Amino acid sequence: MKARSVVTLSDVAERAGVSLATASRVINGGTRAVSPHYRDRVLAAASDLGYTPNAHAQAMARGRSKMIGLVVHDIADPYFSAIAAGAISLAGSRGLLVLGNTLHNPDYEFEYVSTMRAQRAQALILVGSRTTDVEHTRRLTDEVAEFIEGGGRVAAVSQDTLGADTVLPENRAGAHALAAALITEGHRRFAVLGGPKTLLTARDRVEGFQDALAEQGLEPPVVIEGAFTRDGGYTAMCGLLDLPDHPPCVFAVNDVMAIGAMAAVRERGLRVPGDVAVAGFDDIPTLRDVAPTLTTVRLPLAEMGRLAASMVLDDEPRTTPRVAPIAGEVVLRESTIR
C-alpha cells in the first residue's frame, strides 16, 4: 500500500484557491486580517485534507507560541505534582499546551528556560525550592530576565528571588503555628527532620518551629538533616531513634519525609503516636491513605498552581513583580494525639 503523503500548507492553499501567504495568515495567526469568506475556505480545505499546523510556524507568525513551560523539580513528588496539576487544569482550559519538567538538576532548569525562550513560549511557571546556592540563583534569575525581556511571562512558586511574579507559601509562619498547636496538645520535647540546609524552604520551616519553642521557653529541638524525600525521612528518623532518650515528638519538614519517618518507627516495633508522635507539612493528596492519619500544615497545592498559571495568563501590564502569600493551616490528626 502506498504511504500517505504529508499534507502541506501549500496543499491547503491550492485546495482553497488562495495564496500561500493568505493560508498562512489563517492557519498560523499572522498579524494581517483575512476576510471571513477566505478564512472559511482555508479552514474547510485544512479540515478536508486533514492538515496539521506546524507549531513553530505558528509561533513565528504570532510572535509567541501557545506553549507554557512548566518547570518542576520532581513530578513524582506529590507536592510538586499537585501544584503542577493545578497549573495544568487552568492552562488547559485556555487551550494552551503545558510542558514539564526537570529532575532536581539545576543545569536542566537553565536549559529548559533557555529552550522555552528559543521556542518563543508564551510563559513559564517555575515550581521549585529556593536554594542557598548563590550562583544557581543568579544564573536562573538572568535566564528569567531574558525571557521576560523577550515578551514572555514568568511566575514562580516558592522562589521569590527571581524577579518574577511569585506564589509564596508562608513556610516559617506555618511551622511556627504547628509548633504552637503541638505545645497546646501537651508535647514538650521535640525533634525536627530538617531536610537539606541548602533548601531555603526547609530552613524556613525549621526556623519557624524553633522560634515557637523558644517563645514558650522550651528546649531547642534536636535537628537531623535528611534528603527532602520519603527515604530521607526514613534515614533521618533511624538516626534519631538511635539516640538515647530521643524526643518523643517529631516534626518532619514535609509530608513525604514524615511518611518515611513513620515507616522507620514501625520497623523498630514502636507505635505512632503511642511511642513517637509525628507531624509533617504540605498536606499532600496521598495522605488520605496513610495510617495513622498525619498531623500536618495544609497548603492549597492545586490552588497555588492555578494561581501561578493565572499570573502568566492575564494581560494586565505591570512594572513590578507581584507576590501572593499563601498561609498554611494546621491540621491536627491521629499521629500526634497524646
Region locations from a protein language model:
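Short, flexible, glycine-rich and Lys/Arg-enriched loop motifs at helix boundaries
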Residues: 27-33, 128-143
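Short histidine/acidic/glycine/proline-rich micro-motifs that form metal-
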Residues: 28-29, 74, 103-104, 130-134, ...
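N-terminal helix-turn-helix DNA-binding module of bacterial transcription factors
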Residues: 1-66
